[in-house]
Amino acid sequence: MTPEVVKMLVIGLAAGLGFFGPALAFGLIGFSAMQSLGRNPEARGAILTNMILIGALAEAIGIYVLIVCIIMAMVVK
């Protein structure tokens, strides 16, 4: 394998591992929200608001990972 191929494989591995955190966070957010709604259905508005806010923060981490991987791919020549 050439060094360029190895670098691209490393970038792909970094992206895969980097997106694992936000994916896990989204799963836990959804699980916790559904569990909270099951216990207290009247608090739907507050739970939904917090779920969307935390989901946006988790998505930001995924976007940062994507940007870093794109920059790393541009540097490889």
Question: Language-model segments: which ranges?
Answer:
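Hydrophobic, small-residue-rich transmembrane alpha-helices and their short perimembrane loops
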Residues: 1-77
